[in-house]
Each structure stands twice: as C-alpha cells, then as structure tokens.
Amino acid sequence: MSRFFTTGSDSESESSLSGEELVTKPVSGNYGKQPLLLSEDEEDTKRVVRSAKDKRFEELTNLIRTIRNAMKIRDVTKCLEEFELLGKAYGKAKSIVDKEGVPRFYIRILADLEDYLNELWEDKEGKKKMNKNNAKALSTLRQKIRKYNRDFESHITNYKQNPEQSADEDAEKNEEDSEGSSDEDEDEDGVGNTTFLKKKQESSGESRKFHKKMEDDDEDSEDSEDEEWDTSSTSSDSDSEEEEGKQTVLASKFLKKAPTTEEDKKAAEKKREDKAKKKHDRKSKRLDEEEEDNEGGEWERVRGGVPLVKEKPKMFAKGTEITHAVVIKKLNEILQVRGKKGTDRATQIELLQLLVQIAAENNLGVGVIVKIKFNIIASLYDYNPNLATYMKPEMWQMCLDCINELMDTLVAHSNIFVGENILEESENLHNFDQPLRVRGCILTLVERMDEEFTKIMQNTDPHSQEYVEHLKDEAQVCAIIERVQRYLEEKGTTEEICQIYLRRILHTYYKFDYKAHQRQLTPPEGSSKSEQDQAENEGEDSAVLMERLCKYIYAKDRTDRIRTCAILCHIYHHALHSRWYQARDLMLMSHLQDNIQHADPPVQILYNRTMVQLGICAFRQGLTKDAHNALLDIQSSGRAKELLGQGLLLRSLQERNQEQEKVERRRQVPFHLHINLELLECVYLVSAMLLEIPYMAAHESDARRRMISKQFHHQLRVGERQPLLGPPESMREHVVAASKAMKMGDWKTCHSFIINEKMNGKVWDLFPEADKVRTMLVRKIQEESLRTYLFTYSSVYDSISMETLSDMFELDLPTVHSIISKMIINEELMASLDQPTQTVVMHRTEPTAQQNLALQLAEKLGSLVENNERVFDHKQGTYGGYFRDQKDGYRKNEGYMRRGGYRQQQSQTAY
C-alpha cells in the first residue's frame, strides 16, 4: 500500500466535513519526513484507488494506443518495440486474464496488427519505399505475430466473424464516457465514490443505504460501460477483509462524503434518470433508422441508371458583350488556376475549348483563337502531372488534332507571327491593320508532342496489337514535324531550324530505305518508264534527305549537342545501308570517341547504338577485324542491353534507388528502335572465332599469348567443362562447336554449324542481304580454316602442294597463293614458295612439340631453383637482399645466375 495512506494516525478526526485544513502528523519513527500539507485544490481533487486488474488493463490499452498510432504513420520499427512490451505486459496480467478471460480489445489489436502487416507485406511498391530498419522490422514482426497468434486462434476467429459488435460497443462506451465525465464535473456530491467503495463500509447506516441505492440505479450503465473491459462494480473475491477495511477507512478520509440530505438524494436520482433516458433515446433512434433502411422489402439490382446530362459551364453572364478584352480576361482567369491543387484539368480543357467556340462565333479574329489554342495544347500536356505517366489515347488524338488545326491557321494566315520572344504586353490580337503577334512557340509544342509519343511507345506492351496501333501514329507525328519544318524554314530562326531538323533526323535515321535499295539493285535500263516516274514522284531518298539536313546542322548549329546527335545519326544511317567507308570516315573525322564520355546519357546511348551498327556493317562487308573492334567495348562489358538503352539489368537494379530507376527507364528507346541482341552477340562471336582460332593455332606453344576476346574464351571454357556434349541448340553452342571444328581445319563441319536452318532463322535471315552475308561467311570460314590448318600441321609436312590445299578447302589457286604469301611475308609461317612446282616448302625453324615441352620444363625448373634459393636465404637470415645477380659468392662462395636457361658458375671475387 502507498505510503501516502499509511501516514497519519487512525485517531485523527475527519475534519474534511467542516471545511478545515487537513494537517497530517507523522507517526512515531518517521522523524526524517516533513508533515504532508494538503492545499485547497488538493482537497477538492477526487482520488481513486484502482484494483490490480484496472492497472494491468490500463497498461495494455496504453501500449495498444501507441501501436495504433505507429500503424497510422507506417512506423513498423515502433510497432515491433511496442509489441514486445505488450507481450511482457500481457504476461504480467496473466493471472487476471486467467480469472476474467482474454479481453476483447487485446484480441482486436492482435487481429488488426496481423492484417496490417499482411497488407504491408503484399504491397510491393510500398516495401521498396521502406527504409532498411522498417523493412527488417516488418519481416521480424510478421513472423512473431503469426507465431504469437496461434495461441489465440479461436478468439481471433470469433472476433473476425462479428467485428461490428465490438465497434458498436466502443462507440457507445465513448459516448457514455463523455457524458459521464460532464456529469461528474457538474456533480458536487462526489458520485464517483460508489464505484470506488465496493464493499459495505462500517460507517453510518445512512451512507450504506445511499450507496446501495446508487449501485442499483447505475447498474445498467455500468454493465454497458464495463462489458468490453471486463470490469464490474463488485470487488475481487481474492481481496482480504483486512485490506478492504483499510482501503475504505482511508478512502473515506480523503474522498467527499455521499449526500445525506433528501434534496441531494433527489438531485442525484434525477441525474441518473436523465442519463438512462438519454441512453434509451439513443437506442430507439438507432433502431428506427435501421427499420427505415429495411423498408421496401428486398434490395434490387439496378441494371443501368439514367445518364446525367452535364450542363455546359456558363462562361459569361447573360447579356455580356463579348469583346477581345472580355475573352482575354476570361482566359487569364482560367489560366490562373492552372497547376493549383484541386484543379480539374479536364474541366479546364473544356472551358478553353468552349472559349475558342465563343471567340469564333463572335468573329474576334484568328489572333485570339491562336492564343487560346496554344493554351489548350499546353493544358493537354499538363493533364498528367507525373512525368512517367503517358497520355490517354483520346487525349493524344485531341493533341494531334489541335496541333494540326493550329498549323492550318498559321499557314493560312501569313500575317500572324508567333514566338517566345514576344511579350504579352506587346501582343497584337485584334488590330488587323498591323501584323498579328502572339506569344507562343510552335517548336516547343512539337518537341513535347514527340516526347509524349516516345513515352506512349515506352509504356505500351511491344508484343501487343496496341503497340502496332500506336506505331501507326508515327506517320501523323512525322507529317506534323514536316509541316512545322516548312513553316520554320520560312519564318523561323537558325536555331529553331536546326532543332526541327534534328527531330526530322531522329525519325529517319533508323529506317531502312527498301525502295532506294531496290532501285540500286535494279539498273535504270531495266526498269519501266512508269516505275521511273513513280520514283521521281516519291521525292528524295532518305540518304539525300539525311545528307541535306545534317550538312545544314554541321554548318549552322552553335550547340555541340545537336551537332553530335546529327553526326551519330548520319553515321548510323550510312552503316545501316552498308556504306561502310563513309560511316567510318565520318566517325574518325568527328573524333567523337575522344570526348563522348562527357556527353549526357541519351547521347551516350545513341553513340553506343551507332558503334554497334557500325560493327554489324563491317561484318556484312567481310571486315571481321573492324567488326570485332567496333563491338568489343559493348560486348565485353556484359551490359549490352543496358548500354543500348533497351532495358535494365536485374543485378544493377539493386545498385540504384527508385528515383534513379525511373529516370533510367525514361531514357530507354522504344521497342521498334531496338537492335537484336542475339544477332549482335552472334556477329561478335563469329568475328572473334575467325580471329582467335588461327591466332591460337599460331601461338599454341606460347604460354604468354594474349587473348583477343575474353568473352569468346569464356564460351570455349564453358563448352569444354560440359561432361556430355549433345548437338548444339543455342546460338552460342553453335559457335563453340564451329570453333572446335575450325581448330582441326575441318571447314565443312564449321560451315554446317554456322550456317543451317536454325541459325538462319535466328540470325542470318534478319540481314537485308542475307544471301550475300552467307556467301561472305563461307568464304571467310574457308580462308581462316586454311590458315589454321597450316599453323597446326606445319611441323608435320616437309612440303605441301598448293593444289592439294586448293582442293581441300575448295578455294581457287590464286586465293591460296595469296593467303600463303601473306603468311610468309608477315613471318607467321616459316616456309617458302616453290613457283615451278607450286609447293610450299617448310623450313622447320619452329620447335617441335617435344622441344616446346623441354623448353617449358627448363623454364619451370629455373623458377623453382630461384624460389628455393630465396627460401634458403630467408632461413639463414639474409634479409637485406638477394645476391644472385652480383659477382660475389655466397654459400661456400658459390652463386647461381640464370642466363639463357642454364647455370653459370662465377669466379670468386671480393665483395
């Protein structure tokens, strides 16, 4: 029991009834303590002695309240901490719970917390936004709550079957608590005593009767209030009579006494009756509302409602004269709310369209109409505040129509000048005697339109029909860009012309011109006159168009970025149409490879795409070394997909946050611009095979030979590690199998692995001139197989006939002669040509296989001797240096020197 109640003598008189100040004297033995003086405020304060059950339950409810607050702010770490404390508090209250039962509020928090954690766990986007501590706490708490709730499965199931009952009890309890607190504030007679004094007091009989009556009157109210919390107005049976007596006697000293007069009794009874009446009225009102809701029988499913006729908003008051000033004022009013929170963007667009109609009906002139249409298009672009969100199809079509209408107006009225440099104060919208001036930039609208088109293509499934439908809109986009190009060529500045030219280039550079390609294959003499006329009417080829646009940018542009993009697109277009030497020369003259690392990421992606296309072009021309060098940087990184802007790698997603991922996804090129990655890898591996296999055969005994392609060697090692080799299936397996055949000089097997139906479908048929590429590949395989054969078996032959080699590799004799001559000149093959007999005579200057092994053994033994000498010096304590390269001796005045692979004994000299 608290020391507060034990202080003082039992014989003190109850002076609180007379209103005198209460002075508590210390008992004997408590000399060090000051007497406790109660002020008047403390005298009036009610003091309540709570049972152990109330204390434990209050501790639980406080923890539950903290958990719910943490759930609202998604603080899972706080939830975990409080849940652990809640479990400990529940353990302390176990004896009370065993007697009274598990409280319903405890079951509710367990069920709600488990549902809340499951929601967070299923929300993948929300989990990504969590910090590290919250994510870790979520996993831990989810496991703990699932394990903890197993002991309360039946209670949680019953609660979930009827959760409304608990909610109604809470609402009713809160209402009664609020009313009860207001009544207690007004009650001057200490009504709360009856809830505290739970046993019969041994004081006056009149007080006991009054308490008994109050308990009977308040029985219904207390039952409803204490139903959930499992509290009652009766005391616990476990309390002893002695403790009860002490509590009641001490409480009677500090609490106000119950009313004793008849007037006080009547007032208290009246208040209780009013409270019971209010409670009854609330229940009856709720029942009436439920009956009203249930009137009319069963519910019926409504198939369709009557469509609401949406009234058009009224722009102007009735009778208002529509003038330029009134319309411009209304336009400014609409634009003032643009971008503000809560603004309905669709309604704003409708208002602007209605304003255009009003301006046209009242003949206010094209100046006002053009100004409003500029704002309509800008509002369409601002409809989606999120940068990653793309336009809806209806909004996109509306945007295209508005831009076309605006261009029709600008082209039809040549006296209208638009530009960003025109201030709103200097606009001329209605004075037709002078040229009309409108603030706005048609180039900005077209660039934004192009960006929206790219965004639509990025966010559409590339394998769906919807993507094809959206791709058809590119014709409209290109037509608008072409119209704006012609308009700006007449009225635009040099900078604007360069920008619109770049837009035109970006929609042209990646397209293969099949018509121009067919015209190149068909000579003019072989085509009919109608075909020639049709070719003339089609306009200039894409090559001529690219040449004209790019040269203008090279000469007029003042910004490095536009010129760089134009050069890269020009190189890409040359490479796509197999103009290798023009593309290579333009790349070398531009020196872009020296400073491309300083460019922004979209330009770097364009550079990577151009280099890849350049490498594929070199491969088609049979220049395997140039193709390999162009593709080396992209393929050796292992991130070709990411470097070409065609997707993000899963392993790299962990290295960036969510914002960086969104930015990089916006940089991805649409699917119709993608370069086939399997074709790219196949071209690289075949080029590496044609270079690496002859090199490996020429330097087979060289332990220090370098690798031309690490990725190709990796594929070879993967193939060698397989214990059981079946027929090749993937593209990589075909290249590895072909490489093994080429090592043996078997060009026919190599050819069958590289060129077959499966490889044709995956790779070779994707080229514009597939037959030409296959013919080139067969020729390269024959030549490199011949080189490999000579390198591998030169030690076997004393001489070999070139005719034999020609028949073996199905090459004509001049080609064989040329290949062998180059090998001899480059000192790759130690041999000579005997012209009269057409034979190759081997000189046998290269060491044989046995000699190579002996040389390797001698080299390894020499390194072993050196290592042993170092270990010996270390044991003898010679830490200062190693003297084998000096003339003095050591270890019995003898030293060892490695010179040319053998040991020489040096003469003894003084050190």
From Swiss-Prot:
Task: Identify the main location.
Answer: cytoplasm
Acidic residues bias (residue ranges): 166-190, 216-230
Q: What is an example of a GO molecular function annotated in this UniProt entry?
A: ribosome binding
Q: Which residues carry this modification: Phosphothreonine?
A: 522
Residues bearing Phosphoserine are 9, 11, 13, 15-16, 18, 39, 166, 178, 181-182, 907
The answer to keyword Oxidoreductase applying to this record is no
Q: Where is this region: Disordered?
A: 1-44, 157-299, 520-540, 883-911
The leader peptide range reads none
* Pfam families the record matches: eIF-3c_N (PF05470), PCI (PF01399)
Biased region (Low complexity) positions are 8-21
Sequence ranges of Polar residues compositional bias: 520-529
Per the record, residues carrying N6-acetyllysine are 99, 641
Q: Name one GO cellular component term.
A: eukaryotic 43S preinitiation complex
Gene Ontology terms: biological process? formation of cytoplasmic translation initiation complex; translational initiation
- Give the UniProt subcellular location, in the record's own words: Cytoplasm
Compositional bias, Basic and acidic residues, is annotated for 199-208, 259-276, 884-897
Is Phosphoprotein among this UniProt entry's keywords?
A: yes
Q: Which controlled-vocabulary keywords does the entry list?
A: Acetylation, Cytoplasm, Initiation factor, Phosphoprotein, Protein biosynthesis
Residue ranges constituting the PCI domain according to the UniProt record: 671-847
Post-translational note: Phosphorylated. Phosphorylation is enhanced upon serum stimulation.
Role description: Component of the eukaryotic translation initiation factor 3 (eIF-3) complex, which is required for several steps in the initiation of protein synthesis. The eIF-3 complex associates with the 40S ribosome and facilitates the recruitment of eIF-1, eIF-1A, eIF-2:GTP:methionyl-tRNAi and eIF-5 to form the 43S pre-initiation complex (43S PIC). The eIF-3 complex stimulates mRNA recruitment to the 43S PIC and scanning of the mRNA for AUG recognition.
Quaternary assembly: Component of the eukaryotic translation initiation factor 3 (eIF-3) complex, which is composed of 13 subunits: EIF3A, EIF3B, EIF3C, EIF3D, EIF3E, EIF3F, EIF3G, EIF3H, EIF3I, EIF3J, EIF3K, EIF3L and EIF3M. The eIF-3 complex appears to include 3 stable modules: module A is composed of EIF3A, EIF3B, EIF3G and EIF3I; module B is composed of EIF3F, EIF3H, and EIF3M; and module C is composed of EIF3C, EIF3D, EIF3E, EIF3K and EIF3L. EIF3C of module C binds EIF3B of module A and EIF3H of module B, thereby linking the three modules. EIF3J is a labile subunit that binds to the eIF-3 complex via EIF3B.
Give the record's family classification. Belongs to the eIF-3 subunit C family.
Stated name of the protein: Eukaryotic translation initiation factor 3 subunit C
Organism, as annotated:
Mus musculus (Mouse)
Lineage at the top is: Eukaryota, Metazoa, Chordata, Craniata, Vertebrata
